[in-house]
Amino acid sequence: MFTVNKKPVVYSTRDGAEVLKGKISLVLKTLPSLFVLPPTPIQDGSDYTITPMIFVENGQLRLGQPQVPFSDQLELIKDEPNQLEVDFLKKLYIISKIQSTINDFEMQPDMGKNFALFELETEFGSVDETVWYNRLFDVQKFQQMVEENAAEVTLESRTTDLWAGVTPSFTPTAFVTNKINLETEIPNLRQESELMVFDTIRVNATVVACFYQDLIKYNQDFNPWIKDYLAQDKLLTKKLRASDIIRLMIAGTTPRKKYKMINVYVYPETISFTVEMLLNFDSTNGADNLKKLIKTIIVDMGKEDAYDQRVEKEYYYGSYSAPINVPIFVVKDLLTNDSNVYNIAYINESALINTRRSNLNLFLKNSSKDLKQHVGVSLFERPDTVGTFVRLKKIRGGAELQTTIDTSMGVVNKLLQYSVGKVAQVFNYYQTYINIVANLDPTVDLNREKENLLKVQAPEIFLPNYTRLCNKPPVIIEGEPQPEDGTILKFPIYGEAEPRYYKCPYPNYPHPGLRRNTTLGNRDTFPYVPCCYQRPQSMNKNYNTYYNQAVYEQRINSGEIGKTLKILAPKRIGELPPRINKLLSYSTKLKFYRYGFKTSLYSVLDVLNTATGSAATIEAVRRELSTRVELCKGEISSLQTGEIAEKIMDPATYVNPRLFKRALEDYYNLSIILFSKDQDDFSVYANKFLKFICPLRKRVVFMIEHEQAQHVELVLDEETLGHVNKQGSRPILTWDRNDFPVKKLFALYKDRFTHTLYDIGAKRFVSIHNLLMESSLTGTALEGLKRNTFHVYPWETISPNGKIVKSVQPLNQYTDSYGQTRLVEFRWKELRFVSEFQPLPCLAIAQVPEADPNHYTKPLEYFIQVNDKLTEEERATIREAFAWCNLYRTPLVSDADYRSPYYEFRRVKKLAQYILWAACHAYAQTYQTRPLSVMEWIDQDTRVDPNFSYSRVTISPLFNLDQFTVDSKFIFNSVQLQERVMFNLRLISTVNLKVYAANVYHAFYQDVTNFTVPYPAQLALSKTEYYQRTREPLIVQVLSDENVPYLRAGTLYVLENLFGIYSGNLCLFELSLEKLFEKSEQLFQQAVPPNTRVNIVLFNQGVPEYYVLGQNAPELDVIILNINNLWFYGLLRPKLTDM
């Protein structure tokens, strides 16, 4: 105990500065912010004199130092936290000064008041006397603040005493650091929003993709990584979208880590870049490299000035195990209902409404008012293994790191021990209302067996069922021992978890090594796990692959032929895919094989250099190809010639034989017949409507591409391969165009590229070859039809003399992201209407002089509005006149299923915000040209229409004001909404109107052209659009009883009569339902929500068996086949005649 102004204060060694100030303020009857502690640390048994600026005595305000001016006293306490407002403090000072002077004058209060006012005027220059006359309110307010502070200090003191008496009865394991997050925080100097920051991020060969909400800015050279990221857990994707995080995908620098993610958090005052750092390589160099990377990103964004004001932080994440069994629902109840608990910890709204029973996220309170500085805790209920598994998150690094860790562990351990004593009370309370089951058995000591001890010490590595992989588990030894004869293993070393040292306690198995992790749930993070072996492991493949990053290539044995379809090592010989092998064998009567080359992005150049005997360097070939970029425009129509040339010269670009085929053929002066390993067939062009032009040159070469792996191999016949690897032999690796195999293959090659036409009667595409065979046209008319493959559109017919006749005049067209026409506007008589089509080649529509010079490139909203103006009679007339017409209408979503009120509330709330932003933007734009008042704008430019619906309003980063206007009037659907918007508009200052007019509350862009997307970046407005633009084309095959044994996954088939009522349906096959649903979303834009009704037809023993999974709409039809003991899952699509 110590004294302050001769008043006793209880002292405790655990009291910090904030607690001491609270206790002292209690005896001085003031606030902690109105005094400073002595310069020397407070000690037990000492006497101190502390003078507060203002305090309460006998119901009146008193000045601690009446002779010291207000400015000097304010300067003394200015650095104290939770400071009062200066104006309020000045009022309290004036009241206290006058009251103290009156008390000094005793019997002459008026003289004392006047004297005090005279002194105050001398000090301040002038004094508002009404402060004294209205003092009652201010005095009561201050006294109430003092009383609330006293109650809070008393409660905290009582809580502190309670927690001081709680002693954990268990011994936790050591804290293990799992990861470190580096954070670079820069000031948000331009007050940018998330969308504006997303727009400034540059995508290149380092930052390969950027994600925000549904927006994706990407470098298409890294599509496999991006698709892998987008295909991850949907729950994680929802969390990222809900938290408004911008995520950057960074190209990895090691084979083990393909890419790294950087999270960008945008706040009104700051922008934070956070990246996870690997733990166990050189931490100094690793941190420096990551900081340099973040600096490069920030500089590329044009924020050098903000980077100079950066603040760099480190946050540590780790875990430990507490051998105590506490039901998580008990802890959650105490956090919300027990004042002793929620004074040291709290949970947010997400955890409050979460129904998970086995884990809980909470935060520990500290002295900081910034919630971002509170340590996060995750509790996992593990009664059968470790008791309670605890994760500590976001612990600020620095000199106090270990102290913070120890303090946080102490608080959590006390919380768990306190909760154990409340289990029966909480359990009995809930048991009276609901039937609740909890495991209340004490935790068993798991440290008796080696594998269980490993689960306690490193639970992130040694999951349940680890012993099925390794029945000789090692033990963990403390410290950093020196390896002795390969008997000590350090694992892991790449930052997957805290590194530990392992030793094998078995006399016959003394050598620790690595076992391939093929079954555990953490196999993606830990592809190998420790295990004990009889022999040293330093030369083992697993050991060298992990520790030395060794790459094991296939051995080259003369005459040995690889049976798998994996990429071949250089000079290795391997089999062709089954279908290609059969095609070549039947058509040419020769046996062909694959011939391997070194894996690289320019493997096709190695293949062609070898085939032609060229000694040109890769750089020289790229330079030559860059002069032939116009030959690639057919395959890469979305890029300008300069961009294609830049792409070819970029060493990080994969030289794709499909996209650069014509340039390669021109440079090497040969023709390429290209096969696809992934499609098990001829390779196809990217653009399905590209006219097939392939005149054979003198020399022809056969190649096969691993499309997904981005690698090319040579295809040679058996006789040529017999001379390839012989010393001194230089066989000819190309064919002459007049050779029989080339002629036969070229005929098949061209046949695979038969064009299609639109069958008006059947409303579907048909083969041009079949149409010509069935046609009665002859002579010049037939030749004209052959030359004009794609000149026959649904609204066109061919006259007997071969001329094309249009039944209606097209005016405008809407093209999708592939450049294919989907909507066409027509003029017929006095009517205009829009028809929807399957993908068609772009129309050559001549420009018609109109008010809008770009009338032929109308936005989608224009086509929506055209058909809305038609009456029902006009619609019927159009349908009767044109059988091919499918009038386009915007589908209105109607879901009859139950919709959660919470989600409906969120939707309506978001819509209300969107309407307010739209009104702010509309008024701000009007104000720039016509400075109307808010009331005038409401009267002149808005209208109330109770029948107006916001159903067509789409909330997206691209803002469209036309969704809210009719005849240039902003529409409200109620008077109440109009009044509320008017009230909010009045709160906007004139200075901010220009800002709102420019970028709509910083939250939206008005058009996709507002985005900055320099090469090589591309922008997709949604995941669906991304998949549309990057998906691989599907080749439709026919599935009949003849080729069922050769069924291939990832292929789209047309079913024949073997499948009964499903004959004629399209069916996409995959090897699992999960993969099938994923492909459904990517290719057909058909998402599969949880518990979707799936109608399954099993074809196994000849008799179909029917099953149903789930019960919610929409319904999906799936067939399952067993081919050679391999299960195939097929997603049924509508019949071709129904499409």
Curated annotation (Swiss-Prot):
Family to which this protein belongs: Belongs to the IIV-6 295L family.
Protein name: Uncharacterized protein 016R
Entry-linked Pfam families: DUF5757 (PF19061)
Organism phylogeny: Viruses, Varidnaviria, Bamfordvirae, Nucleocytoviricota, Megaviricetes
InterPro entries found in the cross-reference section: DUF5757 (IPR043920)
Domain of life: Viruses
